[in-house]
Amino acid sequence: MNPLRSIQHNIATPPISGGQPLDAVGPQAQQSHPKRISPSQLSQSAHQALERLSANAEHQRLASLVRNALQDGTFQFQSSNHTQVTYKASICLPADTDTVRTDHLINNELTVQARLNDQSEYDIVSAHLHGSSKAISFDVPSPPPAHGSASSVLSERTHLGMSRVLSQDAVDSSSLETPLLSSPDHSRPPSQPKPVHIGSVRRDSGSLVSDNPVVQALLSFAQADQAFPPQAASIAGVQLEMRPRRDIEKALEEFKGAFTVVKAQLMSGANSSERVDEDVNADIHIPLLLKAIERGAAAFGPNASIGQNSAKAFLASCAPKITSNDDVLSEFINQKLKGDDDLQVRLGAQELLHVATKKEFQLGGLAGSIGVSSILGSAWELGASELLKNAIFGKNFSPSQYALQLAGIDSVPPLIIESMDTMCVLAIIKGMKGEEWSMSDLLPKALKAGAISSVVSFPNNVLQYAGFKSRVGDLAANSVTTEAAIFGAASGIPPEVKESEELMRAGLFQSMKDGVMAHSGEGVDTKKTIERMTRHALDIAPGESTAVKSMGLASIVGMIPLIASNKATGLLSEQVLRIFRSAVFNPIEAIALNALALGGRVNVPGLFDSDNAKHARVVQTILARASQHMEAGDRDISAEELHQMLAPRSEFLRHVGSAIVNGMNASFEAIPALVRKLGYGEAPLAERIPYQDLAVPDTSRQPAP
């Protein structure tokens, strides 16, 4: 008696066969069976059943062994009765499940029970794997007859159940029941994350190859110093997946929390030889992850830890796991990865970096910005402006006569509109960074930006009423003042980027001082190293990088009203332009931020890469470097090489936006710098970082081992 029958649970699935005899008076009793059974002799339903089993994590191993043995022709006739036939194959498996070395293989007995159907094809009834220490099996019981003949019953519905039995004495009475579902997607546990990289695998000239570049790089690494077992990918339809091993978003939060620098020892504003602890709350997780990809575990100092785990162990636990419908293949690769700590650290860091740099659409901030600009801007442009001016100057006043007064009136609304819009823009940036924010934090920055916008818009407003006689000169002057007005409207962004840059520099300095991040080494300019790390991190950080690019986009799109006006091409009427200014021009930064976030998901080969494509290239490079250099010390990726993959030089908007942001910050800093030269005010944070202190590691702040 089959010990599994008593615990079988049945579920409805697609048919296993087109017609299946339920008694002895069918083809089973009329025909002798071949000495060997091959895949071509199986029914389509049997092939489908094996496919579904291969997608089930509990039964991948057994299904793969059955398919491989069928393909190799190693199943030999064993016995038969009036209902079914048994085939047996001897196969080699690792004696120790934690190793795949060929010198540890032992013989195991694989048997399948099959039944010949009305089409003279074999349906698989059950399969069993017996070894010295365990047995694995699944059964396909027959359904009870109903509504006529067996063929009609089975063509409509077949009940299929499976059981997996693990024991110390071949088979015991305990089992773990897993239903066979109708598709790989359904067989995946709900909590199991979707694969990040997936590709088909096939054999070619003795090696395994894939159509996916990342999977191909993984295969190249796995077979760099040892060939795959002959059973691996020996049949068609094999797929390999790289999927997260754990909840990556939760892991990222743990990593960020562990490496947020709360205080930094900076120079005192009064005396540069004194050190004071200053609150910085610097987020340095992105530069640390970049450094871990570049150098592996060597990126961290002796005090880098997350809870009770070292940074190295934590990142290794975040490395992706490999799954496949060929369990021999996935087991072989997972064991190769398991034995390479350096590679796991780099892959784990890349997994976290991919999530850390993901740009999310910020609907709330965008809606707020458009709402403020559309309501207040349209109310001013289409009604309030004309009513107020007519009330002050009369209905038939001459605009050129009162140009300065009119420009002054037009410069007042930006103080309100741009202040509220800047609040929305800064909230979007904070949201992209995953940071909490409050009105009290953003309001002073927003009011300052609104005041700047009001002042800077004045020259452009004057030219709307009193231009130059020369059309070329008038157009040139309007172009300059329009760009100035655009920059003024976005004046809340550059200081935000600068603040992030200064805090990150201070955080990296302190982490290196405390032995969290590895010291840059003797003869290396530490200041330049930290500045480069900061620049590379901000170029891919979701908030800052998008903000910088939005400045470049706004500087281009913001010129449309001028180009379409009667000062240039005259394509649009003044009424239409007023609506455009209210609906598009005023909230251009918020629109640009979200447009760029969505644009990061678009991939056009040969033109620009999506964020996913960039990170896939990083994974491919990590694996390729590991294949070329089996020693961890020879695998380092240069900072510039990694930066080029994630932030290519071809990113036009980033270069334009960076020039604008740096120029605006320099102009904002001009007057405070002059005041400091006169002996007033305190040096900015960036100038109070004592890089010279890193010449000797600070052991006083390091915890005892």
From Swiss-Prot:
Gene name linked to the record: hopD1
Q: Which residue ranges does the record annotate as region Disordered?
A: 1-41, 173-207
Q: Provide the protein name.
A: Effector protein hopD1
Q: Where is the composition biased (Polar residues)?
A: 1-11, 28-41
Q: Which cysteines are joined by disulfide bonds?
A: none
The cross-references to InterPro entries, in alphabetical order and at most eight, read: Plant_immune_effector
Q: Which domain of life is it from?
A: Bacteria
Q: Which residues form a coiled coil?
A: none
Function comment: Effector protein involved in non-host recognition.
Biological process (GO) annotations held by this record are: symbiont-mediated perturbation of host programmed cell death
Compositional bias (Low complexity) at which positions?
A: 173-184
Example GO CC term: the record gives: extracellular region
Per UniProt, subcellular location reads as: Secreted
